[in-house]
């Protein structure tokens, strides 16, 4: 792993923010052997989330700047409204050697680049929680200074956490609504399926296990056979059988329209966040300009030494 890291041009992976999404990505990378746990450094204001990183064998700190000084590949996994202030804080430590990845929903590449030095190589990723079991569904988009090398490196790493595809940035917010928020939508549906079985007399634990396995198996069939869901649905239905009766009730309840509206609402919220970034963005014109100039250059040598 160490040799591969040297060849790829990075040695340590950093996480600014240590919440569930950061943990999911870190755990996926570690379990897949993409990075050793001791080469992961995570920062957070308190120990509440950092303790989970320590349990994985990772290094932790309360200093965001330490992450930038120690790691050339850094994931920013803070809450969206906090991220702009964090970027202003760490901007002096950013060099041309860094690859910076944001997983914050609704924070556009233009906002990220506005808060970082001009040469910063920035990418935006929309992950989802199943990354923690290496079954995530992710998309990524590049900033203006990130090229094919950065995109290929990030994709090769994130594929350890599941499926990762590069898309135009306009589709990232749609992915947030479909897959990021979709995890909760699918859980709600799985819960409802199980509760239907419980109502009909099946024990609760068994009902929830079977519901989850049904979703898992169905997803595998769709992916492995490349079928459209409508085709598989038709294959399951028999004239006058149980399935068509159940589907009729789902149609009466507006399942399709409700699911479509849920994705639309979540996507619109992500776009709203993109259009209305934190007030911090408008509060840093002259200060940020100074940070992007001599401040970043002054830290370049220090960053190189810290990573060696």
UniProtKB/Swiss-Prot annotation:
An annotated Gene Ontology molecular function: pyrroline-5-carboxylate reductase activity
SUPFAM superfamilies: 6-phosphogluconate dehydrogenase C-terminal domain-like (SSF48179), NAD(P)-binding Rossmann-fold domains (SSF51735)
GO biological process: L-proline biosynthetic process
Catalysed reaction, written as an equation: L-proline + NADP(+) = (S)-1-pyrroline-5-carboxylate + NADPH + 2 H(+); L-proline + NAD(+) = (S)-1-pyrroline-5-carboxylate + NADH + 2 H(+)
Coiled-coil ranges from the UniProt annotation: none
Class in the EC hierarchy, top level: oxidoreductase
Keywords, alphabetical: Amino-acid biosynthesis, Cytoplasm, NADP, Oxidoreductase, Proline biosynthesis
Principal location class: cytoplasm
Superkingdom assignment: Eukaryota
Pathway(s) of this molecule: Amino-acid biosynthesis; L-proline biosynthesis; L-proline from L-glutamate 5-semialdehyde: step 1/1
EC number(s) stated in the UniProt entry for this protein: 1.5.1.2
The keyword Mitochondrion appears for this protein: no
NCBIfam families: proC
Subunit annotation: Homodecamer; composed of 5 homodimers.
Entry function: Oxidoreductase that catalyzes the last step in proline biosynthesis, which corresponds to the reduction of pyrroline-5-carboxylate (P5C) to L-proline using NAD(P)H. Proline is synthesized from either glutamate or ornithine; both are converted to P5C, and then to proline via pyrroline-5-carboxylate reductases (PYCRs). PYCR3 is exclusively linked to the biosynthesis of proline from ornithine.
Family per record: Belongs to the pyrroline-5-carboxylate reductase family.
Record protein name field: Pyrroline-5-carboxylate reductase 3
Gene: PYCR3
């Amino acid at each position: 792993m160490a040799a591969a890291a040297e060849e790829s041009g990075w040695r340590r992976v950093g996480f600014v923010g240590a919440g569930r999404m950061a943990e999911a990505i870190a755990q996926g990378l570690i379990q897949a052997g993409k990075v050793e746990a001791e080469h992961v450094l995570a920062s957070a204001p308190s120990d509440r989330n950092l303790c989970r990183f320590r349990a994985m064998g990772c290094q932790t700190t309360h200093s965001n700047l330490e992450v930038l000084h120690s790691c050339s590949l850094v994931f920013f996994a803070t809450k969206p409204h906090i991220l702009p202030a964090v970027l202003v804080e760490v901007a002096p430590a950013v060099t041309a050697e860094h690859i910076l990845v944001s997983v914050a929903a609704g924070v556009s590449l233009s906002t990220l680049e506005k808060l970082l030095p001009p040469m910063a190589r920035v990418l935006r990723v929309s992950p989802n929680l199943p990354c923690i079991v290496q079954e995530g569904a992710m998309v990524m988009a590049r900033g203006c200074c990130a090229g094919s090398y950065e995109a290929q490196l990030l994709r090769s790493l994130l594929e350890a956490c599941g499926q990762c595809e590069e898309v135009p940035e306009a589709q990232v917010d749609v992915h947030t609504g479909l897959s990021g928020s979709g995890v909760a939508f699918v859980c709600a549906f799985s819960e409802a399926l199980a509760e239907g079985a419980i109502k009909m007399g099946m024990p609760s634990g068994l009902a929830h296990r079977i519901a989850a396995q049904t979703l898992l198996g169905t997803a595998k069939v769709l992916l492995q056979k490349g079928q459209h869901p409508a085709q598989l649905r038709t294959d399951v239905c028999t004239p006058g059988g149980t399935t068509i009766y159940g589907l009729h009730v789902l149609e009466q309840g507006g399942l399709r329209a409700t699911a479509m509206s849920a994705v639309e609402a979540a996507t619109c919220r992500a776009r709203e966040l993109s259009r209305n970034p934190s007030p911090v963005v408008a509060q840093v014109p002259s200060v940020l300009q100074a940070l992007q100039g001599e401040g970043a250059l002054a830290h370049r040598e220090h960053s190189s030494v810290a990573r060696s």
